[in-house]
Amino acid sequence: MEWDKAKASSGEAVDDRGGGEGGLGYVKVMTDEQMEVLRKQISIYATICEQLVEMHRALTAQQDSIAGMRLGNLYCDPLMVPGGHKITARQRWTPTPMQLQILENIFDQGNGTPSKQKIKDITAELSQHGQISETNVYNWFQNRRARSKRKQAALPNNNAESEAEADEESPTDKKPKSDRPLHQNIAMRDHNSERISEMHHFDTEHEQIRRMMYASNDSSSRSSGSLGQMSFYDNVMSNPRIDHFLGKVESPGSFPHMRSGESFDMY
């Protein structure tokens, strides 16, 4: 009996699925409200996917534009020039001769790295002569300043080396001055020694004469009248060293170190 009921119920289910054309029917899984919610979800997912694609493109373009930023530096700008030309990160910037000349002139006139506004103005001016960005201008001034400091630090070393080379070359420069004949050097040395001995002999004689004159003055002071004075001059003139001394004085070549017009104080 239960079997008959189950068979009857299965027959009713077949009748429910049946109907329509040819007896082929379908089972309605979702209601109309559920279908509408599903359509809305699909539309939202499609919008999200489109937004993700746009975000990916924007991020990729931004990474390409900021690839030249300096890490740890607050000064950063996209590698875009006012003309709209884009310089990729892998492309090395090389200034044109005109750009290099303008940059050198600005560096010589200014003090160090220009301000950010000044860099923008320089970039706008240099963009007329080729591709360039603000980062290129900033980096160029930094590198140029570093090269200038290294060059200034190397100047004292070059001066020291030049002085050392001059000291090394000085003996060779002085050598021709001493390359005189040997007999001339010997003659000059003998002449100098002779002059020294003459001066020493003259000083000795002068000292002896001065002592004699002091002694004669003492003796004449003790004597009386003109007789004492006559005896003093007789003693002086009778000394044979006086004749030798007068001959030395009268001879013009005896004392070449004394110039004309000069006097010699005997007292």
Curated annotation (Swiss-Prot):
**Pfam families found in the cross-reference section:** Homeodomain
InterPro entries given in the database record:
HD, Homeodomain-like_sf, WOX13-like
Give the DNA-binding residue ranges: 88-152
Q: Where is this region: Disordered?
A: 148-195
From what superkingdom does this record's organism come? Eukaryota
**A GO term from the CC aspect:** nucleus
Q: Where does this polypeptide localize?
A: Nucleus
Q: Where is the composition biased (Basic and acidic residues)?
A: 171-195
Where does this protein have coiled-coil stretches?
none
Q: Which UniProt keywords apply?
A: Developmental protein, DNA-binding, Homeobox, Nucleus, Transcription, Transcription regulation
GO terms for MF: DNA binding; DNA-binding transcription factor activity
Family (UniProt)? Belongs to the WUS homeobox family.
Q: Which PANTHER family match?
A: WUSCHEL-RELATED HOMEOBOX 13
Explain the purpose of this protein.
Transcription factor which may be involved in developmental processes.
- Spell out the protein name for this chain: WUSCHEL-related homeobox 8
Question: Which organism is the protein's source?
Answer: Oryza sativa subsp. japonica
* Taxonomy of the source species: Eukaryota, Viridiplantae, Streptophyta, Embryophyta, Tracheophyta
Q: Which gene encodes it?
A: WOX8
